[in-house]
Amino acid sequence: MDARATELLATLRNGNVSVDVKTTSLAKLKSEIKQKHVPDAAISPLFESFRLAIASQHYSLSSAGFSALGHLLKRLTLQEQHEAIALQGRATYQLLLERLGDHKERIRSQAAQAFTDFWPAASADVEHHVLGAALIGKNARAKETSMVWLAKMTREYGLLFRIYVPALVTCLEDADGVVRDTAKSTVIELFQSAPPRAISDLKKQLIQNNVRKSIATSILSSLGANIVADSETSSSFQSQSRSDITRPATSFSHRREEVPRSQSVLSMRSHSNADVHNIPKIDAAFKSQSKPTRSGHSSKDPTLSHTASSESLPAPRQDTTDGEGVEPLYINSHREFDDTIREMLPHFEGKESEQNWILREKSIMTLRRLTKGNAPHDYQQYYLAGIKSVLDGILKTANSLRTTLSAAGCYLLQDIARTCGPAIDPMVEILLQSLIKLSAALKKITAQNGNVTVDVIIGNVSYTARILQHIWGACQDKNVQPRQFATGWIKTIIIRQGKHKGSIEHSGGLDLIEKCIKKGLGDPNPGVREGMRGTFWAFYSVWPERADVIMSALEPKSKNLLERDPNNTHRGVASQSFDGSRGSQPHSTKSSLKEAINAQKKARLAASSNVPSRPESAQSSFPDPKSGRPAPRRPTGTSTIRVPTGEKLSQSASLSSAPMRPASRPRRPELVRPATADPYSSRRSAAPTAQSKASSPSDSPQKSKSKLMTTPRSRNPLARPKSRMDNAANVTNDKQRADPAATLAPKMRRRGPSEPDVVSAAARARIAILSPSRTEGDFSVASSQVKIDQKAEEAFQGTPTRGIENGTPLPASPLRSPLKGAFSTPTRNRKSSDGAPPSRIPISPSYSSRRSSEEPMLPRTPLDSRRSRGESDEAASQIPAPVDQSPIIDAINSQSPGILKVYEDPQSPHSKHSIVLGDTVPKTPGSQAKVMPLEELPLNESTTVPNRKHNQLPEHTPLLQPSPILTPSSENSHRRWKKVEGSERRRSLSPRSKDPVKAQDMITRGLARIRTGALDVHGYRKFQNLIKYHESISKDDTKYEDILMALLEALEKPDGDKGAPSGRSLDLKTQVLVTIRLMLVINREAFAAFYPRVMTAIITARKQYELTNHIVSGLEETAEDIVSACNPPQVIDAILDLLETEERSFESYRMVAMGSYILSGLLRRLNNQKLYLSQAELERLGKFANENLRSTQPDVRRAIIDFCPELYDMVQSEDAFWSMVNSSVEDFRPLLTYYIMRRPEKIG
């Protein structure tokens, strides 16, 4: 071979030899190289010969040279002569670079392949020549070929391309169009599977090199990222309307107060303090006020998690607008955030000038976008440190004379306060000093922005005494604006800290608040006085005694204006209280007081004689007008309370010597708002009368307002252990309220040694039947006789009963036989008014399985524990104190001595008679049963329908383990949902609606309005009553399907009217959901066919609402019902079909998170039943998990992490599971392994 190599070299150098001869000689030697060993002496002549051939201008000879060179390099590689390859390559690279820029594509590709063949032996040299010379050279063809080569080497050999990204980005702006297109495709290919950090660096490179927007957008959209040019980050803010500036102070800081909610059932929060929209409730007075929103900035981002102190509360959020929305900016590392802060620091140095104010505005907008993004949550420590470093610049911006720049700074501070909450406590001092001074600015817009910012900060950070000291300083300011704004700030603190009065009282803040209120009520400016009046009544709701002292010290004119203030919802109580205090004055006598009382009595009696007729849909009878307002709360166990009427006390004014104007036309006392029509009726409670021996089970008669009554405070003797679904029982301090949406299956207490084993005859005497005049949601006064229907008797025959006190099994009555699949509803006991100890009642097997751990009979299912969250308003069952025997007892005792039977509501269309526990109230002339809004529910609902409110399940329902869809829910939101759902039961039906023919016509017309979206809230409620009353509707499969499909479409439909108040559309959607749940209850068999469709509608509807909306609890509850009863494979396919086709958006992550938790619950159910899915379904689930593990939303990632352990159990094969779920780009194996192994069953 040595001789043939030398001969070939001579042939190629001879110019007289034809090209064909040279090509033939080269081909022969190539064949020999492929088959034989190449000696060392022949290496140099061969390389020289091939270089001559490649350099030839003849295509055939050049192509043959490339081919022979490739075979030679492969042969030498097999012979492991890498040093010889590297040595000869140094003399070959320049020639290959020239050919890399050849105008023929074939030659360029062969040259690139030659570099590829050299790369294993001399990678550094090859990269230097191709990527360090050709890529940055001037030859466009060489650039194009080198980029293609880079993509190929990265794909096949794992070449690290990071250091060549700047050169690639430079090529994106090359003058040659082909180079630009190749560069774009190369960048997309290289970064297609790159980590987020690399994509972030690419964004910076694109911005630094000023790559045209079309190219950058195309690249980033292909990579799933986005970019916003710096020029677009600065935006001018819309000025606030003049009406917002000139409004009186009473319009500021009137926010509703609500209990902070915990986490949701299906959608867990990212942080413990996330997204609390409202503040805790203080008094029912604030519930009936309409509260105007304040101008400012709205935020929908969750707040920071933090360690809450005893004085701190979750950060509330206001529904305000700043004129323009801000697009969130997401970062991938804390270093990226630090770099951003470092770049904007120079812009805030020195004074504001024409050169730097635009840069400052851009920086503020960038900080707002970062605050809206993931920086405060994922990198909290670095975010707070960065904000602290630029805080001085932010305050400079807020105090700028440029209105736009000042507004931007204020909006940023509001965003920070809402997002971080108590985490910014160390900065509050300096912020309040600057912003209170800003609120005194001459520019109304600037002053208003300062006011709103101070209010937002106060409403979101932890309370300290220094905050009140700053407000006290504002109350003493010489400018009117800070004094006027201070009224709203004080009210915010009172409302927010109302449930935690100790933090204010123990720090001396109460004295400061009193000083502020006194100074405000006596301020020379009428606007300040008007604003402070509203603050005074908020103060009155929390500290009524201290407020009485302040009010008694006012002048008569000021006191009169204060009592007539619109914010005064305690007018009756306050007027009477102060009238009583005036009664001790010398000019007030007992005779005048008696005359006033007698005149009021006569007026009431005369008015009650001519009571106008009322429509049945409102209320069939009028309640006593004395129950119009609740009695005020007192801290002692028994309190003396004046019961007010709803009318204005014209005679009360005569008790004072002050001259009074003639009163306006008085309200008719008999037209008190009925309980069924009062939207706030569910929030009011009436204190039971202790002296009454026989009273209604829901309320007791009250004395006239002229007399004093003593109301003992009843306590809850038996507390149910908290489930993980609820964190606190919804029981007021005054009395226990019955939640109309849920009937508790209470934990029975142990029998004392002196208590009997059976219900005494006197206790059994307190049984009443439902009055025919009442609707199926209420109790009423009992008649004196009971007729027990034979059918109702047979329905309960043979049901095993337990001892009344000790819960031991008793022999079944021969007249009773078990009902298959039916569950009797547990009754409720109430504590008697005279304090008699409670007695037990018979309970069903399903009820006994949920008794306390001290009396175990059946194992409590995990599903039972998760069902208990709506039952926190109920106390342990008790029987009232005994009264005289009645014929009712004889009827009961004749059937089964020692056993208390409970039947269904006689007014219900599904039953004949009903016997319930209650007090017998003897009717006297001139008195009637009062219909109070908070009353007991009927004890027995349909026994053929499993009732989630009683923790009952069908016998065939498997026991489920706690599922991720049952994570702790928001107490406040769930309570509101329960109130909404339960309130739909307290409605009567008109005679026209009871006619089946007319009802069918109304159903048809209502269905048409549902489809067009024209049905209002009251229409939905009437529609629900029609469905509940007429069984024929639920039994007609066609009609049932039409109604259900229309309701599901209405539930999925997004809110189209953006200009309307959000509460109206939310109320409509709530009624739609209540109607769907009603369809589920009345016909579960027909509803079961639509489980997949209903589940997809629920997930689609979840997309439209924040986690804090109470409708979310209803959606989650409905999903739980379906999970426990459906065919899992069908529902899984429906959910995956929905989520796989859903377009990714900012709101769609809510659907994905909820769907993931539902899938987790379905898989858990299958795993517990030892049922497995097909391979195709498992692959779909694995693909779903793999795609969403890389989601940018923390809620989605958390849901998928909870979903993966259930999928792991379902797949069974560990290798198959990791091949489905794990990603080649990012290894999730350690994270998922941790969560799989930390489960209780694995640890145990």
UniProtKB/Swiss-Prot annotation:
Q: Which GO terms describe its biological process?
A: astral microtubule depolymerization; cell division; mitotic spindle assembly
**Residue ranges of the region described as Disordered:** 232-326, 561-758, 795-998
Q: Where in the cell is it found?
A: Cytoplasm, Cytoskeleton; Nucleus; Cytoplasm, Cytoskeleton, Spindle
Residue ranges with Basic and acidic residues bias: 863-872, 979-998
Q: Work out whether the entry's keyword set contains Cell cycle.
A: yes
Report biased composition (Low complexity) as residue ranges.
232-243, 652-663, 690-703, 837-850
Tell me which family the UniProt entry assigns to this protein: Belongs to the CLASP family.
Q: How does it assemble?
A: Interacts with microtubules.
Recall the taxonomic lineage recorded for the source organism.
Eukaryota, Fungi, Dikarya, Ascomycota, Pezizomycotina
Spell out the residue ranges that the record assigns to HEAT repeats.
87-124, 159-196, 1038-1075, 1126-1163
Gene Ontology CC: one annotated term: nucleus
UniProt-recorded name of the protein: Protein STU1
Source organism of this protein record: Coccidioides immitis (strain RS) (Valley fever fungus)
> Bias category Polar residues: which stretches?
261-271, 287-312, 574-591, 607-622
**Cell division is among the record's keywords:** yes
Keywords, in A-Z order: Cell cycle, Cell division, Cytoplasm, Cytoskeleton, Microtubule, Mitosis, Nucleus, Repeat
Mind listing the GO molecular function terms for this protein?
A: microtubule binding
Reported function: Microtubule binding protein that promotes the stabilization of dynamic microtubules. Required for mitotic spindle formation.
